[in-house]
Amino acid sequence: MSQVVVCALYKFVSLPNFESIQKPLLAHMESAGIKGTLLLASEGINGTVAGSQLAIDNLLQWLAKQDGLDSIVHKLSFDETMPFYRTKVKLKKEIVTMGVEGIDPLKVVGTYVKPKDWNQLISDPEVLLVDTRNEYEVQIGTFKNAVDPKTDTFREFPAYVKEHLDPAKHKKVAMFCTGGIRCEKSTAYLKEQGFDEVYHLEGGVLKYLEEVKQEESLWEGECFVFDNRVAVNHALEKGQYDQCNACRMPITELEKASEAFVQGVSCPHCIDNISEKQRQRFEERERQMQLAAKRGEAHIGSDVGAVIQSRRDNKENLKKSQVKLNNKKYNK
């Protein structure tokens, strides 16, 4: 395959027939060689997929023919290799999980700010700039002077708002996330809580990096993405970070040189959190992956039970690593 096009897309829209879209959408993606995951719910569609330019163009055209799925918000970036292993279309209760009932971006949402106007907004000293992403995302890159809520999941964001933000004190609040979808709900939530002037970066960080010249940019570092690239730089190319296969935390080359790093088994973030049983399981998984690589295959696991357990281990270790990271920062 030539250069791979990675497409992050979403749209909040009433989709009462979302379940009936699943099978034909999956069939279209599989026939076009598109990999990645799309989520469908009664509130819309969300996900990231990858394929050839023609395949992605055809997918967007196919979606536009479905009731309500025209004019989908999407951002394109590129990679030399396919960043996903599988093709999935999942049915969900929400396309982005905040855990608060009744939040509807179709009814109320913050003010969209174009990337070209973002610098001016966040340079206003009266504006509180809040990063709505998770702690491990913030660690590798964020906007200058942005507040880090130190959340491990988006579900924790409402609690952060209740504990740290006040409509009477914070008159102007600007928020951002990777592609814009989390801000649809976070700004809607703030509006529901009585905040008056609430803004968010239209298209998210990815759109900002695409449209704003690097010499004019207020972005510092790289942007975490939820695929095998781990992070992208300002040119939207694969960045310098790798990812620990045990805990999923982004890691640098320096961290990979640490004695705590064992490929597929541990890294400095999670080495103290892994049990001996988990270590043995990770070592076996890595061995199978290496064997598959020698055969020119992608190891995705033939034992369903082992795959499920591995995912549970990854989530558990990620949580522990994030807590460890937060505690380390708090203790400074």
From Swiss-Prot:
Known EC number: 1.14.-.-
GO biological process: tRNA modification
Entry-linked SMART domains: RHOD
Keywords from the UniProt entry: Oxidoreductase, tRNA processing
Every Rhodanese domain range: 123-217
Keyword NAD set for record: no
An MF annotation (GO) of this entry: oxidoreductase activity, acting on paired donors, with incorporation or reduction of molecular oxygen
Gene3D superfamilies in UniProt: 3.30.70.100, Rhodanese-like domain
Keyword tRNA processing attached: yes
Reported function: Catalyzes oxygen-dependent 5-hydroxyuridine (ho5U) modification at position 34 in tRNAs.
Alphabetized PANTHER family for the sequence: RHODANESE-LIKE DOMAIN-CONTAINING PROTEIN 7-RELATED (PTHR43268:SF3), THIOSULFATE SULFURTRANSFERASE/RHODANESE-LIKE DOMAIN-CONTAINING PROTEIN 2 (PTHR43268)
Family the UniProt entry places it in: Belongs to the TrhO family.
Protein name per the record: tRNA uridine(34) hydroxylase
Organism: Shewanella woodyi (strain ATCC 51908 / MS32)
